[in-house]
Regions:
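Structured loop/turn residues at beta-strand edges in well-structured enzyme cores
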Residues: 32, 85, 120
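Conserved beta-alpha-beta core of the PfkB/ribokinase-like small-molecule kinase fold
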Residues: 36-111, 132-134
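A generic local structural motif
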Residues: 23-26, 52-53, 75-79, 111-114, ...
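A residue-level structural signature of the nucleotidyltransferase/glycosyltransferase Rossmann-like core
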Residues: 18, 63, 89, 124-126
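Short, acidic/turn-prone active-site loops that include or flank metal/cofactor-
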Residues: 15-18, 70, 95-96, 148-150
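Conserved phosphate-binding/catalytic region of the ribokinase-like
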Residues: 58, 102-191
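Short, hinge-like loop/turn segments at secondary-structure boundaries
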Residues: 3-8, 81-85, 107-110, 141-144
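Conserved N-terminal subdomain of the carbohydrate kinase-like
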Residues: 1-39
Length: 191
């Protein structure tokens, strides 16, 4: 990532093994019921995205966690519909939420987006708003978890670290609100 003095970032991404999934590799995986599975938009928008979604559709009792990232606009509509039919927990930043709202014909206003998301997909949603914290929406609850005060040095990796914190919280049995709180804490340490 290239960071300009004003904090604007430009990413140069190159695909590697993470986008080379094949049927043989997936067939060897044992996924226990109740597992959390992380997928990135880079994987889902790559040529192996179709294969990953086909594999996901066959799994029972798992929670997909999807961080679409900047590739949210690159996933074909039909594949995106199949992904959302798996009722994943989706984590978006502010810009990605705007793109998602447009793609799914939902409101871009965060609280309305969350309500409409629940009505349309019955799946959890996290919207990360940098220093304003993160909103979470689920069938059970919704709310905004404030960000932790921090001295921002470098925001590269903030979204990934937030995802890691949320996943660690969920894997530990925390409810979504507390998992988002942990994600906020981890992201504040990284930036």
């Amino acid at each position: 990532a290239l960071v300009e003095p004003d904090g604007e970032r430009t990413f140069m991404s190159f695909s590697g093994v993470e986008n080379q999934w094949n049927r043989q590799w997936l067939a060897r995986l044992t996924v226990a019921p109740g597992s959390l599975l992380y997928f990135s938009g880079y994987q889902l928008a790559s040529p192996c995205g179709e294969l990953l979604v086909e594999w996901l559709e066959k799994l029972q009792d798992v929670t997909p966690f999807i961080d679409f990232g900047p590739r949210i606009g690159d996933i074909p509509d039909a594949l995106l519909a199949r992904i959302m039919a798996c009722r994943p927990l989706v984590s978006l930043n502010r810009q990605e939420a705007e793109i998602a709202a447009e793609r799914f014909a939902l409101s871009a206003e965060i609280t309305t987006l969350g309500k409409q998301w629940q009505e349309k997909f019955a799946a959890p949603l996290i919207v990360r708003l940098d220093k304003e914290g993160a909103w979470y929406f689920s069938n059970d609850a919704s709310g905004c978890i404030p960000a932790f005060p921090t001295q921002v040095v470098d925001t590269i990796g903030a979204g990934d670290s937030h995802a890691g914190g949320v996943l660690a919280g969920l894997a530990s049995g925390l409810p979504l609100a507390d998992a988002v709180l942990l994600g906020n804490a981890v992201a504040s340490w990284v930036v």
